């Protein structure tokens, strides 16, 4: 079964969409009220394979014993903490989905992710907030296989 990490999980919307296809989903979110809402939402939706942890992604990653098969990233405007990126890359998952609300943060983080062996396979911009300057960008990242794999 698939273990999914949903980092910066908010109220758990993405985690709950992925839950039926996964064996287990772990959501990490710094806003405690959002984590409480995520737990209630999962319960209401009858999902028993979701765990939500309140805390900073940078610190929580050090405490997780599970090994993810897929990582979903949906960070705030400032993007992913520079010290968290190497920890995320180190998991070596085949695929990551990065959902960004600020293209410049995404561009900065992609440089690090690409240096860590990931390639952006597909990028899709979504105008979630018409008539504003805001744009959501969804990026599918794939781990590049080394010559001996």
What is the meaning of each model-derived region?
Residues 1-149:
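Rossmann-like S-adenosyl-L-methionine
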């Amino acid at each position: 079964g698939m273990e999914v990490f949903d980092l910066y999980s908010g109220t758990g919307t993405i985690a709950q969409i992925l839950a039926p296809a996964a064996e287990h989903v772990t959501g990490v979110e710094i806003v405690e009220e959002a984590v409480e809402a995520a737990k209630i939402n999962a319960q209401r939706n009858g999902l028993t394979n979701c765990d939500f942890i309140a805390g900073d992604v940078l610190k929580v990653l050090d405490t997780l014993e599970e090994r993810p098969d897929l990582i979903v990233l949906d960070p705030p405007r400032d993007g992913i903490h520079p010290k968290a990126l190497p920890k995320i890359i180190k998991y070596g998952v085949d695929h990551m989905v990065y959902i960004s609300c600020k293209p410049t943060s995404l561009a900065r983080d992609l440089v690090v992710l690409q240096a860590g062996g990931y390639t952006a396979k597909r990028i899709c911009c979504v105008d979630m907030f018409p008539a504003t300057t805001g744009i959501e960008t969804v990026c599918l990242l794939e781990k590049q296989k080394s010559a001996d794999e």
